[in-house]
């Protein structure tokens, strides 16, 4: 049984992540990893982030206007505790899960790698969820940015960088952009 996965970050750093709460069903598997924020005072530190991957016969059965096609055969959406975009100005369309492009790309690459390894050519639905996400999100900028119902899945490097002046400046810039977009 797989208890650990290797993840190559966009910075080229290999991480070995312990899997928790592994559940298998006939055509579905889910597991969680615990978020580690290092020295960063991140309110999401220690929470469990779940991924559920489900085999589906026809991709058209899994698409909703709010899900995102990662590839021809892989579809992604957010579940419980993943915020939804409610205002224009972010990377995602209104209604979509607040999962930014770098994490989406990382998820797609990881799922495609497993599909190649096991010679699976069918369609897959990937759903991320964070049971504590709605409560934790209240302590973030998400409500001010128009992200409701949970946390956002962010990142550019795959590693949590300690809070910096640049991170704060980027957050303020994004909030100003949102205010401009929304009058």
Go through each PLM region and give its residues:
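Glycine-rich anion/phosphate-binding loop at the beta-strand->alpha-helix junction
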Residues: 131, 135-136, 142-183
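Generic N-terminal targeting/processing segments that precede catalytic cores or assembly contacts
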Residues: 1-145
């Amino acid at each position: 049984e797989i208890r650990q996965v290797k993840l190559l970050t966009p910075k080229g750093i290999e991480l070995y992540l312990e899997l928790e709460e592994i559940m298998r069903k006939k055509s579905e598997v889910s597991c969680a990893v615990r978020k580690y924020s290092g020295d960063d005072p991140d309110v999401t530190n220690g929470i469990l982030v779940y991924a559920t991957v489900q085999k589906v016969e026809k991709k058209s059965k899994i698409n909703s206007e709010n899900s995102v096609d990662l590839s021809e055969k892989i579809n992604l959406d957010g579940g419980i505790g993943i915020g939804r975009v409610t205002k224009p100005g972010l990377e995602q369309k209104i209604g979509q899960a607040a999962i930014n492009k770098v994490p989406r790309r990382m998820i797609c690459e990881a799922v495609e790698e497993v599909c190649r390894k096991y010679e699976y050519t069918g369609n897959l639905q990937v759903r991320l969820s964070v049971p504590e996400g709605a409560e934790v999100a209240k302590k973030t900028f998400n409500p001010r940015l128009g992200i409701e119902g949970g946390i956002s899945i962010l990142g550019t490097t795959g590693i949590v960088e300690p809070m910096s002046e640049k991170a704060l400046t980027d957050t303020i810039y994004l909030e100003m952009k949102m205010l401009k977009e929304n009058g």
